[in-house]
């Protein structure tokens, strides 16, 4: 299992939102690249980044901050936010992003998403953000009538590397992951699923290491790390021990 530390970008700074509300942004740092280096030193093996401004604008808005991170760390980076066309996908891959997350466009333009996955196998993830079981788009500002499972099934044979599933109702609240909902989605799809939204403690990491979570590729954590509620060393040690035992 991979534990992805999150860096969410707003105005070039590291922030965390509560339930996707840009008005409830807490700034945790002015130097995203320094934060990325810190995560790398702590032993994390893969970084999760979101251009929040880009998600709302429909095109990248924090390119300088992302490029600074790519220049400073060696660990792979997955990036989402404002990815709506192939030109954006290819520009980020050329700059060194390891995996691109397509969110809103997966619902609005599924053919683009499938084409991106075909052209760049293993490099495209679909971000499915759900509110009360329904997919939310445009930086979570709009909720559709499509369920997470329905959207995921559209990409079963497209070559998508992963589904990143976020329960918006828990995001940024440190109330624990929606394990039941995440496992239900993972059980319905062939694509590996990454859990996001609410991971708050070492107990959540332990839960993710149980046998019934074996299909999950990993989980994303943000606020718990910034608030000091989750000890990176303890979490990564737990994961390493579980891997050795397996």
From Swiss-Prot:
One of its GO terms (biological process) is L-histidine biosynthetic process. GO terms for cellular component: cytoplasm. CDD domains: HisA (cd04732). Pathway: Amino-acid biosynthesis; L-histidine biosynthesis; L-histidine from 5-phospho-alpha-D-ribose 1-diphosphate: step 4/9. It is an enzyme of class 5 (isomerase). It catalyses: 1-(5-phospho-beta-D-ribosyl)-5-[(5-phospho-beta-D-ribosylamino)methylideneamino]imidazole-4-carboxamide = 5-[(5-phospho-1-deoxy-D-ribulos-1-ylimino)methylamino]-1-(5-phospho-beta-D-ribosyl)imidazole-4-carboxamide. Its main location: cytoplasm. It is found in: Cytoplasm. It comes from the Bacteria. One of its GO terms (molecular function) is 1-(5-phosphoribosyl)-5-[(5-phosphoribosylamino)methylideneamino]imidazole-4-carboxamide isomerase activity. Keywords: Amino-acid biosynthesis, Cytoplasm, Histidine biosynthesis, Isomerase. Its EC number is 5.3.1.16. The active site is at 8 (proton acceptor), 129 (proton donor). Belongs to the HisA/HisF family. This is 1-(5-phosphoribosyl)-5-[(5-phosphoribosylamino)methylideneamino] imidazole-4-carboxamide isomerase. The gene is hisA.
């Amino acid at each position: 299992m991979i534990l992805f530390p999150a860096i969410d970008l707003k105005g070039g700074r590291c922030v965390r939102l509560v339930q996707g509300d840009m008005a409830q942004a807490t700034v945790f740092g002015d130097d995203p690249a320094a934060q990325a280096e810190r995560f790398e030193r702590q032993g994390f093996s893969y970084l999760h980044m979101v251009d929040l401004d880009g998600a709302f604008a429909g095109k990248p808005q924090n390119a300088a901050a992302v490029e600074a991170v790519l220049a400073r760390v060696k660990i792979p980076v997955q990036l989402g936010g404002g990815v709506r066309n192939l030109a954006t996908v290819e520009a980020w891959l050329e700059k060194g992003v390891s995996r691109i997350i397509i969110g809103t466009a997966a619902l609005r333009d599924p053919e683009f998403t499938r084409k991106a996955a075909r052209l760049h196998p293993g490099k495209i993830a679909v971000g499915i953000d759900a509110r009360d079981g329904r997919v939310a788009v445009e930086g979570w500002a709009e909720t559709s009538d499509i369920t997470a499972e329905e959207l995921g099934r559209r990409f079963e044979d497209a070559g998508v590397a992963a589904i990143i599933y976020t329960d918006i109702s828990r995001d940024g609240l440190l109330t624990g992951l929606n394990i039941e909902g995440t496992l239900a989605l993972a059980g319905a799809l062939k694509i590996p699923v990454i859990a996001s939204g609410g991971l708050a403690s070492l107990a959540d990491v332990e839960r993710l290491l149980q046998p019934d979570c074996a299909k999950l590729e990993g989980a994303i954590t943000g606020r718990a790390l910034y608030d000091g509620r989750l000890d990176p060393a303890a979490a990564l040690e737990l994961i390493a021990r579980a891997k050795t035992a397996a």
